[in-house]
């Protein structure tokens, strides 16, 4: 990405770039927000996952050039322009300015954290202030007092297309009210307090209105279930996760899928193959649900302030129709494993924490009297109760807990 970064600081949508128009692309044109932001998100994810600060050092100047590009094209209030394709292949259309502004805020948040890690105090303050500015602009422009997402109407007409006299006028504020329009600001931390609660409620209402199916595209899908779980609606997240109707994660599986497809219906038993254009059968975007499976179903999460899983946040969410869930992965300190199994009166939770790390555990339990340590008690800190949850600190080691309803 650095080698092919455009002179204006923008990135293209994918690399390497091959061919020439109309069948290929040149790298002298900016890509789309949601794609270009990989220039910020990838270094962030590498650093957070592995703790290697060198990737930030090597990529810093490139990231600054990209942020400068975004700042030049932003509106005076801090919101972003409506350019690009937005939530690609979504069932419901979400205003592109809304999604671009949400990503701009997220970029600023990551830049502030990475600047602080590099000892760039002034830059850390600059990007933190930018995040606050864009966050305020997002709420002012795209959220009404009832917590519903809105946006200025922009007419789209092909040349020669007749004007609909009943259509809104350009600039009229109209509802957006899509799943993506709530998932992004919720996940990116743009909504606080009552507005956050209202947005979660509107998100759930939209899901229910669509028969408990998702309507998100490439931009919204990765954040949909995490936003629900962080908003206290694990029940809805599990309903979506297990849904088999179109569109859903399991719908393609029932049509014979063994890979992630570009479209939910790239192939159906009833109708066969879809259009040959944009119909990839090996297209990871919707596979982002795997992140929720690890971070919420199994509950293995990173601590942003202590990268590389030096400190692990464990918040397993037991739910759905599954009898058990278990899994893990290698961290720089060793393998972390987490799993739960339902019982007649609750569940049993097992976890292994690598050497030279610690963890904060949050269990779904009515109170400390409902939690029993079956093994590893010597490494378990005191229990604390908080709103239907029990919290404790863990040292490295293996543990087993019994939680009763």
Stretch-by-stretch model annotation:
Residues 37, 41-44, 102, 109, ...:
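A structural signal for well-ordered alpha-helical segments within the folded catalytic domains
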Residues 1-4, 43-56, 180-192, 221-231, ...:
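Alpha-helical support elements that line or immediately flank enzyme active sites
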Residues 235-405:
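Non-catalytic C-terminal accessory modules of carbohydrate-active enzymes
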């Amino acid at each position: 990405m650095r080698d092919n970064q455009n002179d204006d600081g923008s990135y293209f949508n994918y690399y390497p770039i091959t061919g020439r128009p109309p069948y290929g692309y040149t790298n002298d044109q900016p890509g789309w927000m949601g794609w270009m932001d990989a220039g910020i998100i990838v270094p962030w994810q590498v650093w957070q996952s592995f703790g290697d600060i060198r990737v930030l050092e090597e990529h810093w100047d490139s990231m600054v050039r990209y942020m400068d590009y975004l700042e030049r094209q932003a509106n005076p209030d801090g919101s972003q322009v409506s350019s690009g394709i937005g939530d690609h292949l979504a069932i419901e259309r979400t205003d592109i300015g809304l999604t671009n502004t949400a990503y701009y805020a997220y970029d600023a948040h990551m830049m502030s954290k990475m600047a602080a890690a590099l000892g760039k105090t002034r830059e850390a303050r600059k990007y933190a202030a930018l995040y606050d500015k864009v966050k305020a602009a997002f709420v002012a422009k795209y959220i009404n007092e009832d917590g519903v997402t809105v946006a200025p109407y922009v007419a789209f007409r092909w040349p020669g297309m007749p004007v609909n006299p009943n259509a809104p006028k350009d600039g009229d504020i109209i509802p957006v009210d899509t799943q993506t329009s709530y998932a992004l600001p919720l996940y990116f931390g743009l909504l606080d307090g009552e507005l956050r609660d209202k947005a979660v409620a509107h998100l759930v209402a939209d899901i229910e209105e669509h028969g408990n199916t998702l309507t998100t595209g490439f931009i919204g899908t990765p954040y949909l279930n995490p936003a629900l779980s962080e908003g206290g609606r694990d029940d809805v997240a599990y309903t979506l996760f297990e849904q088999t109707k179109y569109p859903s994660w399991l719908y393609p599986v029932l049509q014979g899928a063994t890979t992630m497809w570009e479209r939910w219906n790239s192939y159906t038993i009833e109708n066969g193959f879809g259009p040959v254009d944009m119909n990839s059968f090996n297209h990871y975007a919707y596979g982002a649900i795997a992140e929720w499976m690890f971070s919420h179903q199994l509950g293995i999460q990173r601590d942003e302030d202590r990268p590389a899983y030096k400190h692990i946040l464990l918040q397993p969410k037991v739910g759905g129709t599954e009898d058990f869930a278990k899994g893990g992965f290698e961290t720089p300190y060793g393998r972390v494993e987490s799993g739960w199994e339902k019982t007649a009166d609750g569940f049993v939770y097992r976890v292994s924490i690598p050497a030279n790390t610690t963890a904060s555990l949050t269990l779904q339990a009515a109170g400390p009297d409902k939690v029993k340590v079956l093994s590893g008690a010597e490494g378990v800190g005191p229990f604390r109760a908080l709103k239907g949850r029990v919290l404790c600190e863990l040292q490295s080691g293996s543990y087993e807990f019994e939680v009763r309803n």
